[in-house]
């Protein structure tokens, strides 16, 4: 999955308009980013990237944090 594909998948999970999710968005700025959405996001990360949620991912507070962690693990491909 590409980085942009991950962002599109997050938009679907969070039920926000396409291309509206910004890297600075977080649980604080997206009302739909609930604990249930967290479970869906972590499920996506596990199924698409084979990355199990750990402390670093669980502590990620924004889209930017999630992207940074996934990039550091070489998860995205173009």
Task: Give names to the regions the model predicted.
Residues 1-78:
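Phosphopantetheine-dependent thiolation modules in NRPS/PKS and related acyl-activating systems
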